[in-house]
Amino acid sequence: MKKIILVGRPNVGKSSLFNRLAKQRIAITSDVSGTTRDTNKAEIFIDDKNCILIDSGGLDDSNELFKNVKINTLNEAKNADIIVFMVDGKNFPDEIDKRFFYELSNLNKPIALVVNKVDSKKDEERSWEFNEFGAKYIFNLSVSHNLGTDELRDWIYKLIPKSKIKADTSDDFDEFLDCVNEHGEMGLPSVDYETKNIKIGIIGRVNVGKSSLLNALVKEDRSVVSKIAGTTIDPVNESYVYEDRVFEFVDTAGIRKRGKIEGIERLALHRTEKILEEADIALLVLDASEPLTELDERIAGLGAKFELGLIIVLNKWDKDHGEFDKVVYELRDKFKFLAYAPIISVSALGGKRVHKLYPLILEVYKNYTQKMKTSRLNEVLEEAIRTHPIPRDHGKIVKIYYGVQFGFAPPKIALIMNKPRSLHFSYKRYLLNKLRENYELSGTPVILIPKNRSQKESTENEN
């Protein structure tokens, strides 16, 4: 079985990428340098191929402990088959990274240079500087926002042999898909989204005005408002009825930089994540009077992580409309992964424009829970494919036979194909854009899953 090792200096995102590729939270991720000192290993599947993924300790010469970690890491790299060398895209290349990269390149193994934390246009421009490493394979990633990982997975996939073990293709999903195919839309779960309470988490860093926004939304002083950062530790729940729908608002604890989180706030952060697991929509509150920060981006990533409907709320807004357009442009550049989220400006303390959030929440929730008729969905897909045919895979035709919605909140669509591995991420993005052109999908993510039609049949034939 092929071994793939993730290598790099401390705090470049190795453990986050390990968790992303392993699709489970095995490694501890933190902003503290050197969190991973021992190697973590997991057997993983890259689609239908299995391999051993290794998360190594950080390469660092700063003290005796880290020197030992570095020696262990280099020994692991010698025994690995594929090396993924990671650097921090927020910084310019330096000689230490180059030295480590060249040392690993001399092992004569397939090696990729991964520039992580590329979250904006500015980061993309800076990433060009890493071409001076002379790496044959370079990938720009934002692991925290799950951007660019598909290309890296494709590269790894081509380097590992086909597995003799069948990957877990999720029997529940296959059975569910069979049910949809047999019974059409009637086979989908019957949740009464038109009457259930809408759960809304209010998220943001400390002191951006989340509690003021909650008070303005429910029209009473339920949450303590203070200039002292971090006044809200326990989540604050409040309900409000609008057009016969119950909105359940939760003002979550403000989130600080990880290095500043103390014990009680760590618990509050854990509670915030638990709340978001149960939520339908997140209101991401940003302070319009301050520049956007990396922490804002990380918190925004929580909305994407939990696949929530999302509205970006610019609080403390006292600028004119021309300024709004400028701020929106900057936001869209920084938060590319939230391109679907509507943006609204408010002044929570003064109650300005807060009332516009109620209909917007209803609109986003409707989009988030909508059912797409299979016939209409396939008309849209067929038109998209006619306009821009699916690129071939090494001369072989790639086909989408049909699409079917298999989940809601958010909409989840299976693309039944002959070669799901061959659907390039850029074409997937093209299909998503076409769906957004033809459906009301503002405020909601849409999940597309390529699925092999013969996968289940071939498994049954082998038994």
From Swiss-Prot:
Family per UniProt? Belongs to the TRAFAC class TrmE-Era-EngA-EngB-Septin-like GTPase superfamily. EngA (Der) GTPase family.
Q: Which SUPFAM superfamilies match?
A: P-loop containing nucleoside triphosphate hydrolases (SSF52540)
Q: Which organism is it from?
A: Campylobacter fetus subsp. fetus (strain 82-40)
State what protein this is by name. GTPase Der
Q: Which GO terms describe its biological process?
A: ribosome biogenesis
Supply one GO molecular-function term.
Answer: ribosome binding
Organism's domain of life? Bacteria
What is said about its interaction partners and assembly?
Associates with the 50S ribosomal subunit.
Reported function: GTPase that plays an essential role in the late steps of ribosome biogenesis.
